[in-house]
Amino acid sequence: MKLPTETENVFSALRQSAKPKPVSAIEKLIEDAPDRELCRINALAFAARHGLDEDDVIGAFLHGARLGLFDMSWNILCPACGGILDSGATLKTVRQAEYRCVLCARGREPTLDEMVEVTFTISPRVRRIAAHDPGTLSWLEYYRQIFWSSGVDLPDDETFAKWVKETTLDSRELLPGE
């Protein structure tokens, strides 16, 4: 996919403030990756996968977020299942004394060192992905892209669907507010 001129201009600015290797890897990601890989990107995992310096990658993603390439989110995680209990644009959004996990049905007191991750999602102004409209995702894709954190290593689609079929007795999709 060829990036629009406006996005190319943002990458020109990013090249001025971040190291070239991470910027090139991010540009390739935005151009070539499927939608799912552009939702909740973990900078540390990205660095490891591409053999890049963690600090350089973190810097590139932070600068990219400031330039509007990514939306940065602070995710509160369930330590038991890895689900995202809450998400906000700043650390100040961690205000509750307890967060309840809908999957585990347990309350958790937030601890910043164990329950918070920072992720980056492509901005809809740069490239629109399915996760920008979570209400349109099937329940399976919703859990894969929205509910579980970047640290949950899920299998390929076929294996995942088979596993869900074998372990799920019934499912019902509810419209928002139901």
What are these regions (language model features)?
Residues R66-G135:
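Cys/His-rich short segments
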